[in-house]
Amino acid sequence: VAAAPADQSATMSTVTIKGEVFALNLESYGEFGEEMGLWNNKISGIDLSKTTILNNLNLYMNPIRTLDVSGQPFLLELDASYCELKEIDVTHNPELRSFSCYGNSLTSVDLSKNPELLVCNVKVNQLEAIDLSNNPKLEEVNVANNYLTAIDLSMLPALGKATLMNNELTTVDLSHNPELIDVSVGGNLLTSLDLTVNKKVQMLSFNDNAIRSLDLSANTDLYKIDCGGNGMTACELNDFFYTLPQRAQVVEEQPSANLTLL
């Protein structure tokens, strides 16, 4: 693939990849990126049929609209975010570790053939459901800004970061995710949340739900909480405050010792 001209833009229609290419970065940052000296590609298509050994493919913010990675059995990382995609097939990529496909128009995604997946970011799509039962190694899941009414995380024991905000979830079961550190469930329809098993949680956001009480006394690693927009009365907020893990001593040199309540 030829290098972009000095203005950091590469305007073309379809790119054909040939030969022994292990990693390919064609990420773009649009007009704003161009102003900052970053890439502004305008690739509308990519042909990968003449190479089969890709490990890493980054097509971020190129208007390709369709993408065929079925001939890439060794693909480890794929970023097809903001590519105007309505569908994508990754069932032929069994080694996939990182899958980023956010900011598209996906209504479904099949991850049943990706058992090695560690990171899944499909935020800002049109998903109404997602099945993660065949991805037991997942450490990070981001499904924010979709239309999910339910999500099953029970088969993800290694999950450390769950970003589920701005969906239509009425319940979230985190009792099988003891490694969670970062939990974001704001902007849903939750009335309760149980984090008694999640003793490693450090950051918690459950704003804009209908949660009127929550006992976090066992979550002693917490240092940041966003609980706004739940309709708590002054008394309920006061009761909630006194369930928070208290710091016996705050050391100025360690700001993380402070508990921030938003």
Task: Locate predicted features.
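N-terminal capping/linker segments that flank leucine-rich repeat
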Residues: V1-T52, N56, G71-P73, P94, ...
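Conserved hydrophobic beta-strand positions in leucine-rich repeat
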Residues: L24, M36, N55-L59, L76-A80, ...
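Canonical leucine-rich repeat
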Residues: I46, L67, I88, V109-L111, ...
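Eukaryotic tandem repeat interaction scaffolds
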Residues: N177, D182-T191, L195-R212, L216-N219
